[in-house]
């Protein structure tokens, strides 16, 4: 019987196990399921030697090839996240290991968080809250921004970006521009979006929201040059991955008021340094990478991971494969 390893934190499992009990029971009929915490790299290597599928191994990127050489039976890595930049995809592909994320199961939570940041920044909500808690009342009231009828620009229009677009169009009557070299115009139109080059999106949008995975091509794709293209009244939001944005360039743009404000949930280094300039700025709202942190997204993530591993073991094509070319090879 093939072995599946879920190294999930005990506290998280206490919340999700009851809901996922039926899914786990189905998986246990076809696989030996090991659910336990693993705390050291040595333990990861030892426990993974005879594993067929594993969820979210916490292996340093630089050690992935060594890990894969040890895990000789491994055929599937299933993340418990949308992002997969922590996994050496090239090494996995070479070894014939398919890597899957959890696709759209977190999309609604992230899209809602994106809009929470947009609205907070546009209406100075957090800023007003700080003034009130400090005993004050007066704030620069005339400097809030209405969103109705404005232009929303998306960098990436997949499951999350598409949901952000639909909310902007239906709730605020916004025009939608999107840059995504991997999406066809017909797909963008489903979300009411018009595709454009990145420069056009940045120049013409009143709100710019980033929804792209972190890859070598997207690292620092938003830097000083890109911030200089934006309107001084623009709101910039990132709920994708921190290194997609040059954080120093963002801080400089905010400090010099090249943009109106920003809402940031992801950072180049996490946790964020206590000395980060973003912690001290009034025109930025920051949250600690919590855009996907809802009970619903949490539950759906684990259910999605369990069921996708079950699909793979049963010989079905798994959902959300990142390196699809592996699936064409015989297992």
Model regions and ranges:
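Conserved beta-strand positions in the Rossmann-like core of class I SAM-dependent methyltransferases
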Residues: 34, 177, 243
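Hydrophobic Val/Ile/Leu positions in short beta-strands of Rossmann-like dinucleotide-binding domains
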Residues: 6, 152-154
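C-terminal helix-to-coil terminal segments
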Residues: 23, 93, 101-112, 268-331
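Phosphate-binding beta-alpha-beta segment of Rossmann-like dinucleotide-binding domains, i.e.
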Residues: 95-97, 103-151, 163-171, 321-322
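Rossmann-like adenosine-cofactor binding region
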Residues: 62-63, 181-277
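A short, aliphatic-rich alpha-helical micro-motif
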Residues: 45-49, 68-71, 147, 201-205, ...
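An N-terminal-biased, well-structured beta-alpha scaffold segment characteristic
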Residues: 1-100, 223
């Amino acid at each position: 019987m093939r072995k599946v390893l879920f190294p999930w934190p005990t506290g998280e499992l206490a919340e999700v196990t009851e809901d996922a009990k039926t899914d786990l029971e189905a998986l246990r009929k076809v696989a030996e399921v090991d659910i336990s915490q693993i705390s050291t790299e040595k333990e990861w290597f030892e426990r993974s030697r005879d594993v067929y599928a594993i969820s979210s191994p916490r292996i340093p990127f630089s050690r992935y090839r060594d890990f894969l050489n040890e895990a000789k039976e491994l055929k599937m890595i299933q993340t418990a996240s949308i992002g997969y930049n922590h996994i050496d995809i090239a090494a996995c592909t070479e070894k014939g290991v398919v890597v899957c994320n959890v696709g759209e199961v977190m999309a609604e939570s992230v899209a809602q968080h994106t809009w929470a940041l947009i609205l907070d920044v546009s209406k100075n909500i957090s800023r007003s809250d700080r003034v009130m808690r400090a005993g004050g009342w007066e704030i620069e009231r005339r400097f809030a921004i209405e969103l109705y009828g404005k232009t929303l620009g998306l960098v990436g229009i997949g499951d999350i970006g598409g949901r952000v677009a639909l909310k902007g169009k239906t709730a605020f009557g916004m025009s939608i521009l999107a840059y995504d070299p991997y999406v066809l115009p017909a797909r963008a139109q489903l979300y009411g979006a018009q595709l454009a080059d990145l420069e056009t999106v940045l120049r013409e949008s009143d709100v710019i929201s980033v929804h792209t995975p972190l890859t070598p091509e997207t690292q620092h794709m938003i830097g000083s040059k890109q911030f200089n293209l934006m309107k001084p009244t623009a709101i910039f939001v990132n709920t994708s991955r921190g290194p997609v944005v040059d954080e120093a360039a963002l801080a400089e743009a905010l400090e010099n008021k090249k943009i109106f404000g920003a809402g940031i949930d992801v950072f180049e280094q996490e946790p964020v340094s206590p000395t980060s300039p973003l912690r001290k700025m009034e025109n930025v709202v920051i949250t600690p990478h919590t855009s996907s942190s809802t009970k619903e997204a949490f539950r759906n993530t684990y259910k999605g991971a369990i069921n996708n591993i079950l699909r793979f073991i049963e010989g079905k094509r798994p959902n959300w494969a990142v390196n699809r070319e592996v699936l064409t090879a015989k297992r």
